Amino acid sequence: MARKPLIAGNWKMNLDHQQAIGTVQKLAFALPKEYFEKVDVAVTVPFTDIRSVQTLVEGDKLEVTFGAQDVSQHESGAYTGEVSASMLAKLNCSWVVVGHSERREYHNESDELVAAKAKAALSNGISPIVCVGEPLEIREAGTHVEYVVEQTRKSLAGLDAAELANTVIAYEPVWAIGTGKVASAADAQEVCKAIRGLIVELAGDEVAEGLRILYGGSVKAETVAEIVGQPDVDGGLVGGASLDGEAFAKLAANAASVA
């Protein structure tokens, strides 16, 4: 089964709701329609930007999809500051990032919490982008494959085959995020292949063949084609390079060139 690459921009805590409109407009208009036939392009934006992006995408019938960067594991209730998956679903979010390394580090999010957030998203028709990846000391010790496979297993706990079929996994080596260091294409392939092997074990060949595994970690226009060209890498979770609409369009076009 040919997997259509997904290029997902993670804006992190950047761009207000007015800047968001201009950025998505530039992205959509800089990327000719035929490229959207080869790659799916998404932006995951701050909560305060979602309504503006939704109005633009739906009003102008843009091919770009959108989502959030986090979600509560709870459906509703006395959880001050939290945003539920049902709230995101009402805004027609297609995606939500869960377990990003910055959430794991700064908010002490565990694999168990990540799995609960993924479950909440799926229960509301939203595809989670489940992030996993090793820190530098694990990479240097040479145990990164085993580490990431086990982290992925725990971060997907409780999801059945049908839910996994609607899940995206993003491999983001922590040492390559925001540092300018980039894992080689071979590094990305090694781990993404092992993750796919885990999905075979959890859900069978058919689900594993269809599930998209992204690489995240200082993805740039110059490097994306080689990475996405690997057999088990199906796109990128793009940070800083997604904040400029035209630059992000170029990156997506480069990914489409190998699709």
Swiss-Prot record:
Signal peptide: none annotated. Substrate binds at N10, W11, K12, G178, S218, G239, G240. It catalyses: D-glyceraldehyde 3-phosphate = dihydroxyacetone phosphate. It comes from the Bacteria. Keywords: Cytoplasm, Gluconeogenesis, Glycolysis, Isomerase. It holds the Pfam family TIM. One of its GO terms (biological process) is gluconeogenesis. GO terms for molecular function: triose-phosphate isomerase activity. Its EC number is 5.3.1.1. InterPro entries: Aldolase_TIM, TIM_sf, TrioseP_Isoase_bac/euk, Triosephosphate_isomerase, Triosephosphate_isomerase_AS. PROSITE patterns: TIM_1, TIM_2. One of its GO terms (cellular component) is cytosol. Pathway: Carbohydrate biosynthesis; gluconeogenesis; Carbohydrate degradation; glycolysis; D-glyceraldehyde 3-phosphate from glycerone phosphate: step 1/1. It is an enzyme of class 5 (isomerase). The active site is at H100, E172. Involved in the gluconeogenesis. Catalyzes stereospecifically the conversion of dihydroxyacetone phosphate (DHAP) to D-glyceraldehyde-3-phosphate (G3P). Belongs to the triosephosphate isomerase family. Homodimer. This is Triosephosphate isomerase. It comes from Corynebacterium glutamicum (strain ATCC 13032 / DSM 20300 / JCM 1318 / BCRC 11384 / CCUG 27702 / LMG 3730 / NBRC 12168 / NCIMB 10025 / NRRL B-2784 / 534).
